[in-house]
Amino acid sequence: MNFDIKTEQLSDSVYAISLAGEVDLYTAPEFKQQLLEVIAQGAANVIVDFSNTTFIDSTTLGVLVGGVKRLRTNDGQLTLVCSDRNITKIFEITGLDRVFSIYGSREEAVAAIDKELPTSA
């Protein structure tokens, strides 16, 4: 099976989940478990990095929608990183490109979140 997942804490409330390979019916449960774990650990903002992902299916979309619902109840957000046109097209066709902010690189996603986070004076 061609799948790998890595989770990284970028700051107190920002986590990144990097997915590689195929995220489908068989691998999405592991992705869902990681996403729920970082939310339980206090993540308010989660970046899901599809940079090394070769395939997603409707199961993946369901995990993302479930995650964004949980995060938004705590004023959080789910941000996506994806530059693969085949994958971004799936978000456009389903209308989910209006639900998620999608960036071409992790740096862009982090910068966008940093701009929205309240600064401590």
Name each model-derived stretch.
Residues 1-7, 36, 57, 110:
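Short low-complexity stretches enriched in small and charged residues
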Residues 2, 55, 68, 103, ...:
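Broad hydrophobic/π-residue packing in well-ordered secondary structure
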Residues 3-33, 50:
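STAS-typified acidic loop motif
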Residues 6-8, 81, 103:
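General small-molecule cofactor/ligand-binding pocket signal
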Residues 11, 84, 106:
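Short, flexible active-site-adjacent loop segments at beta-strand->alpha-helix junctions, enriched
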Residues 22, 92, 108:
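Acidic-residue sensor for enzyme active/binding pockets
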Residues 25-100:
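Amphipathic alpha-helical interaction surfaces in cytosolic regulatory modules
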Residues 102-121:
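A charged, well-structured terminal subsegment
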